[in-house]
Amino acid sequence: MTTLSDIRTRIRQDLGDADSLRWDDDALDRHIARALSELSLAIPRELTATLETTPGSRELSLTTLDGLVEIEAAEYPVDQFPPSYVRFATWEGTLTLHPAIAPDGGDARIYYTAVHTLDETESTLPPHLEDVLATGAAAYAALELASSSTEQLNLNGDTSATYAGWARARLTAFHQLLHTHARKNHVRPRNLYVPA
């Protein structure tokens, strides 16, 4: 499993900074977090959660869904065939179910998307997105260096322009990869259903 350290190493290789002379870990972690945030919005994790309803109440708290991006569907009651999807609304961390009859305390299954996580022990990124993340983070790191080196004396007068050009090319590639892999660009089968 790839960890934050592994991604940092990939970025250092891309940036030619294997000895950590230009970027410390904290700086790279900030750029990784920024790229991971963008990646998570374009290509979030797809998850389900089972939440217990309160008898007579149509509202469910979404605070237990860590990293929630969007609710895709709500099923109530659960474990029926065909599934009993219901209309719903979300507002300020609350999901309101709209079944014909108020819930009786049974479970509701929520289908949702969430942000990816990456730390020193684990990652939720699928392997095919690790290089996408490294591309974005390296672009942001190079952009920072280009910006900070504009007013500095350098042995090579084109240092800032070189990093800026490289960063722009990598950032363009990153955004194209996000667009290519984004959920909104994939055909997803959907069925119309009569609300329960």
Question: What does each model-found stretch correspond to?
Answer:
Residues M1-R10, A27-L41, F81-A196:
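Internal mixed-charge
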